[in-house]
Amino acid sequence: LDAGVIYPISDRTWVSPVHCVPKKGGMTVVKNEKDELIPTRTITGHRMCIDYRKLNAASRKDHFPLPFIDQMLERLANHPYYCLLDGYSGFFQIPIHPNDQEKTTFTCPYGTFAYKRMPFGLCNAPATFQRCMTSIFSDLIEEMVEVFMDDFSVYGPSFSSCLLNLGRVLTRCEETNLVLNWEKCHFMVKEGIVLGHKI
């Protein structure tokens, strides 16, 4: 509520239930009753998930394509420097048109609420988000940045050109109010992990 992402609303036509699922963390090793070491995934809390299956079934599907990962990785290969940027709370940066907000209504023990910003779980959210990011960076994609959802990989043939390209991408973020998660960003690195692949 305080962040302006949701607001209280009385019951509407579309009301979806909420489920809490474990938020997976890293891996640890735990001894079992036979004193054997067993790899175990740690739980770092719980994530609220809204079951939008009924709304999704009634929604017209958006087939905007996601970029081909292999083509992106090919364009990223063999550059001396990279800046790997991460969008902050990805989908929540996309506002929902006021006429459509009530469709995102969900109910939980604290009341009934609707989203002002695009939540996870909507069938068209990935396509909508990628379309928005592609629009924002359209003239820079494949020249100095690769964009996959909220992961932005800036590159250049030299340190100075990568730094210049980073400046252009950050300026575009500022112009469009796109917020980055600085804790997950890596600047001027010679290698890194992009979409699970080492570059």
Regions inferred by a protein language model and the residue ranges of each:
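Retroelement reverse transcriptase polymerase core
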Residues: 1-199
